[in-house]
Amino acid sequence: MKLLILTCLVAVALARPKYPLRYPEVFQNEPDSIEEVLNKRKILELAVVSPIQFRQENIDELKDTRNEPTEDHIMEDTERKESGSSSSEEVVSSTTEQKDILKEDMPSQRYLEELHRLNKYKLLQLEAIRDQKLIPRVKLSSHPYLEQLYRINEDNHPQLGEPVKVVTQEQAYFHLEPFPQFFQLGASPYVAWYYPPQVMQYIAHPSSYDTPEGIASEDGGKTDVMPQWW
């Protein structure tokens, strides 16, 4: 039993590691390892801190870039406002000038309109005169009523004690006295009846035999007389 216990102890002792031989190496390498650890920690801190700094820097840059266009927009807006105000002033000045020009041109336009109306009126008068001149001259021989009126006009002047006026056929066609001409002669075959004082004197007076005569009856006692028209 004792031998077995000894053999077990020896085996355990042999199986254990030899620590005393390794410790000096560890102790020699300890400072280097500490420095390396510190360096590694610094590197890790830098690696951790750098993204935050980069983020802040990027944020600042973005803010700056955003502020720059806003400033540019503000400048552009001010320039636009100034240009709009200047253009509006120009438009107002141009409109006022146009109004002044129109006010100045109004009298001239009215004068031109009046001249135009007068010219139209004169043209109408000339056309009316030309139409009167171009009216066909109808001979009195083709209108016996006109001949009769012409003769009556000539006969009435000596009776009234007025000087005889020389009247041509054309004047007799357009003007007959003593009545003014309100219509065109020759338009109707019964024109002569519109001149009763001149025409009635040539109407035959009723003769004596046209008067009614009483016819007495054979019976003398009766006094009734019956008129009879022939």
Swiss-Prot record:
Q: Does the keyword Signal apply?
A: yes
Q: Where is the composition biased (Basic and acidic residues)?
A: 60-83
Per the record, where are the segments of Low complexity compositional bias?
84-96
Give the signal peptide as a residue range, or say none if absent: 1-15
Q: Which UniProt keywords apply?
A: Milk protein, Phosphoprotein, Secreted, Signal
Found, by tissue, as follows: Mammary gland specific. Secreted in milk.
Residues with Phosphoserine modification: S33, S83, S85, S86, S87, S88
Instruction: Choose any GO biological process term that the UniProt entry carries and state it.
Output: response to dehydroepiandrosterone
Source domain of life is Eukaryota
The record ties this protein, via Pfam families, to: Casein
Query: What InterPro entries has UniProt attached to this entry?
Result: Alpha-s1_casein (IPR026999), Casein (IPR001588), Casein_CS (IPR031305)
Its subcellular locations are:
Secreted
Region spans: Disordered = 60-103, 211-230
Summarize the protein's role: Important role in the capacity of milk to transport calcium phosphate.
The family database entries (PANTHER family) matched by this protein are listed as: ALPHA-S1-CASEIN (PTHR10240:SF0)
Protein family (similarity comment):
Belongs to the alpha-casein family.
UniProt-recorded name of the protein:
Alpha-S1-casein
